[in-house]
C-alpha cells in the first residue's frame, strides 16, 4: 500500500488515493480507516495535515486539552462523525441523543436547527468553563467535517475490505488479477491497467488461443491465460460452445474444425 500499487483494490485504486497512500505510508489498520474517511470532499484537504503529523513533521493541534484524547488517534484532525458527537458531549455537556441531533443537523445542513444547536453548543461550553471565543472556534472546526464525514464503523468496514483485497493481491497476485479482469471483460481501459500491473509483477500473458484459453481469464502458475470472451464481438455463449467442442473431441487442428 505504501508504494501505491493498488490497481484493483477496493476504495484504494484511484490515482489520487494512490498518491495519498504513498505520502501517508500507512503502517497500521487505523491509517487505512482514516484515509477512507478523509478521501472525500471537504476532509480531503486535511490529508496533508494528517500525514505531516503522523510523520512528526507538524505538531498536532488538539484544539483544547479536554478533547485531546478524542483527537489523539487522528493526529488532531477531526475525521469521524463520532468525534463530533464526543466533542459536543465533553465540551458542552450534550447527552448522546443531543449529540446525535447535532450530527444530523450538520449532515443535512438544516440551517434553522443548526443555528439552535450552535447556540446550545456554545452556551454549554461556556457553562463548563470554556471561553465563548474558544467554543465558537471549535464549532467552526467541527461543522465542515460533520457535513461530509463518515461514521467510523462505515469507514472501518470499507477499510477491512480494502485490506483483504490488498492481502489477496499481495499473496495471490495472479489469481486476484485474473478474477478482477474477468469482472471487467468489456472495459478495455481497465484491462489495460491490469496488463501494466502484470508487467510489473512479471506475470506472463498467454495470448488468445482456441486450444488453451477459456471464457474468463485463468491463472496457471506464473502465466495468465487470456479470456476469449474479452475479444471484441466474441461472447460467452460462443466461447462455451468452443470449449465444449474442444473437451469433447480434442484440440482444434485447423480452421475447418
Question: Which residues are covered by each model-predicted region?
Answer:
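Noncatalytic, beta-rich nucleic-acid-contacting surfaces in large DNA/RNA-processing enzymes
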Residues: 1-257
